[in-house]
Each structure stands twice: as C-alpha cells, then as structure tokens.
Amino acid sequence: MRNGHFITDYHCHSTVSPDGHNTMREMAEAAVRLGVDDLCFTDHIEPLPWDRWNEPPREKHSYDWTAMLAQFREAQEAVGDRIKLHMGAELGECSFAPDVADSFLDDAPPLDFTIGSVHCYRTASGEVNDLTWITSTDPAVWYAACESYFEEMEKLIDWGRFQVLGHITLPLRWAKELHGVELDFDRYEEQLRHVMRRAIEKGLGIECNTNRGHLPLPDGKWLRLYHELGGELITLGSDAHTPEYISCAMEARQELLKDCGLRYFATYDRKKPIFHKI
C-alpha cells in the first residue's frame, strides 16, 4: 500500500525489450522500494522486425522466450514475497502479421496478462511507419496517420488474443512530446466510441497508461466515455522503461478513474482479471 492505495503497475519494460534499459530484477527491486504491491512485466513481442517495420515479418515460431523466463525467475528470487510479480507481454503491431503473432503465442510459456497495442500506421503508399518517425509539425500529417492508426486498432480487436488495449490515444503523446503539436481528438470521438464498444463486446479491456506522470492515455474525457458505454475492465500501467517511472502517478490515476465513474481497476493472474475497488 502507498498513501492508502493498492499500487499496481501493469505496463513496464526490461532489457528483454529492445528499448529497455534495466533488467527485470532491477525493475522489481525498484518497485519494492517504491511501495508497489503488484508488478507485471510487459516486454515487447513484435511479429515485425523491431524498428524496421517494412522488412518482411519475422519467421513463425522464431521468438525465443528463454531470456524472458530467465530474467523473470531471477527477479522472483531477488524480491521473494515482498511484491507480487506477474509475467506478461505487450503484443505490438500484431494486426500487420497476425499469423506470426499467433505462432509466438502458441509457443509461449504461461502468461498472466497481455496488452494489445498499436505504435505504427500505414502511409498512403502502404509503408508501415512508426508514429515516432513522423517529423512534420503539420497537424494534417498527424491526422492522416491517426486515421490509419484506428484502422489498425480495429484489426487488432478482430485478432483479439490479448486482455486489454494499450494506450489507445498514443498519437497525442508523440505529437506533443516530439514536435509540440496539439491534436484535437474530439474529431475521433466516433472512432474511439466504436473501438471501445467493440472491445467491450469481445470481453477486452482498456489500459489507462499513466504515461510517466504526463497526459494519461486515454485521459478523463475518453475514460468517461468508456464508462458510459458500459466498460468496466481497466488496468493501470506506467509504461516505465527505467526504474524511476515505475508506478508513476498511480494514486492520481486511480482517483481519475473514480472521478470518471469507474469503481474498480484490474490485475491479472493467468489471464483472469482480479478486481480492486478504488
């Protein structure tokens, strides 16, 4: 417990991820120091070659789970019963090569939790671009990318082999942080409404990504919409890639959920949700 709150973080990365900086042990030990009760590792599992999205998809059954398992066991041994640790994955870009993603999951060890996420979009010429590759400050360029972003999210929901949708308003982060571009997501209300409704119908949740204490993804307006549509399944994750951001702003985001009408947030064990009253 921290400040009267049960603290969880269901989105963090270790050196198992290509963009991670610290081992699972280091992240888990930091979480203990920060008063986290339940930490789930969600390292990147991608069917496309990392940061080379336009190359052919990876070979089926080519993901090696060995490093993840080894690091997770080391972290468990280091922290003992001082914190609950869960092993999950962030399944990125699976809409672009679902058959490869299927093969990775078919070979996977027992996972507690998976996030389905989109970081890329298709250009007008059909290339796969990462949102972080956009160099323009023209909002029109970003809005064009957003149209494709939501199309990929629809395909991701159709695929559906995960528990929650991650950071569904991610373009807001990169447009602002990289180039100071303020996007108006009100123009995507119908797309977001449709995405949320379809996720609810399929029994999938959404993530409230605390974004390291910056703009939550999604923010209050869209969390209220999720609640109004009947959504109840929501997790909290920092998206920490380094120890100092683990569980960042979790108390404030729990209060945000409550203000938006949501009464619970979820943790997972072997892909089964456990609900915690706010």
Regions found by a protein language model. Give the residues of each.
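Charged catalytic cores and adjacent phosphate/nucleic-acid-binding surfaces used
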Residues: 1-14, 24, 178-278
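An N-terminally biased module of ancient metal coordination in phosphate/nucleic-acid-related enzymes
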Residues: 1-98, 105-106, 172-186, 241-248, ...
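Structural motif
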Residues: 34, 109, 159-160, 229, ...
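Short hydrophobic/charged patches on amphipathic alpha-helices used for structural packing
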Residues: 28, 153-154, 223
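Low-complexity, flexible helical/coil segments
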Residues: 43-48, 76-78, 121-127, 148-155, ...
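Extended substrate/RNA-proximal surfaces in nucleic-acid metabolism proteins
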Residues: 61-201
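Flexible loop residues that form catalytic
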Residues: 44, 119, 170-173, 211, ...
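Structural preference for beta-strand elements that scaffold enzyme active sites
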Residues: 5-9, 38-40, 84-88, 110-115, ...
